[in-house]
Amino acid sequence: MSDKIGLFTGSFDPMTNGHLDIIERASRLFDKLYVGIFFNPHKQGFLPLENRKRGLEKAVKHLGNVKVVSSHDKLVVDVAKRLGATCLVRGLRNASDLQYEASFDYYNHQLSSDIETIYLHSRPEHLYISSSGVRELLKFGQDIACYVPESILEEIRNEKKD
């Protein structure tokens, strides 16, 4: 029997405790879970890709079956096929997230009918945390320590020094 391999993707700009919770829970469902940082190289992100990847790798180092990868200009289903993933993992905070994700699920299934999508609901304590909300707080100099993993906080601090 082959390994169960999953893929959880996002821009993680920055990664939040909500993302980490989904990763930890999904890691228990798969033999191998890839966390894919998908980014647009033509768009200026808040945190450079290297910082996002380094912070994410540190945040998940306690999960032996999780590997962080990055991609650009590729469809999620193509990356999933390349990695041998048969399941995409998506986190949901609310009905709007479900509606948004369902449209991608439709196209992904049309492109590759053997790849399934599973949805994990956010824990109540993470329902209102978003990367855009964290970026907004940072813009106004607010403390974000309770919204992001320590490793991400370190990357943001290091980036601000430069």
Swiss-Prot record:
Q: Any keyword Ion transport?
A: no
Write the Enzyme Commission number(s) for this entry.
2.7.7.3
Binding annotation for ATP: 11-12, 19, 91-93, 101, 126-132
Residue positions annotated to bind substrate are 11, 43, 76, 90
Enumerate the subcellular locations listed in this protein's record, separating them with semicolons: Cytoplasm
CC per GO annotation: cytoplasm
Which Gene3D superfamilies does the record cross-reference, listed alphabetically?
A: HUPs
Q: Which InterPro entries match?
A: Cyt_trans-like, PPAT, Rossmann-like_a/b/a_fold
Which residue ranges run through the membrane? Answer: none
Site entry (Transition state stabilizer), positions: 19
Catalytic activity, per the record? Answer: (R)-4'-phosphopantetheine + ATP + H(+) = 3'-dephospho-CoA + diphosphate
Q: Which Pfam families match?
A: CTP_transf_like (PF01467)
Keywords, alphabetical: ATP-binding, Coenzyme A biosynthesis, Cytoplasm, Magnesium, Nucleotide-binding, Nucleotidyltransferase, Transferase
From which domain of life does this come?
Bacteria
Q: Name one GO biological process term.
A: coenzyme A biosynthetic process
Q: Which coenzyme or cofactor does it need?
A: Mg(2+)
Q: Does the keyword Nucleotide-binding apply?
A: yes
Which CDD domains did the record assign? Answer: PPAT
Pathway listed: Cofactor biosynthesis; coenzyme A biosynthesis; CoA from (R)-pantothenate: step 4/5
EC main group: transferase
Task: Give the protein family.
Answer: Belongs to the bacterial CoaD family.
Quaternary structure note: Homohexamer.
Q: Read off the PANTHER family from this record.
A: PHOSPHOPANTETHEINE ADENYLYLTRANSFERASE
Q: Which HAMAP family match?
A: PPAT_bact
Per its database record, what is this protein's job? Reversibly transfers an adenylyl group from ATP to 4'-phosphopantetheine, yielding dephospho-CoA (dPCoA) and pyrophosphate.
- According to UniProt, the name of this protein is Phosphopantetheine adenylyltransferase
What organism does the UniProt record list as the source?
A: Streptococcus pneumoniae serotype 4 (strain ATCC BAA-334 / TIGR4)
Taxonomic classification:
Bacteria, Bacillati, Bacillota, Bacilli, Lactobacillales
- This protein's gene is called coaD
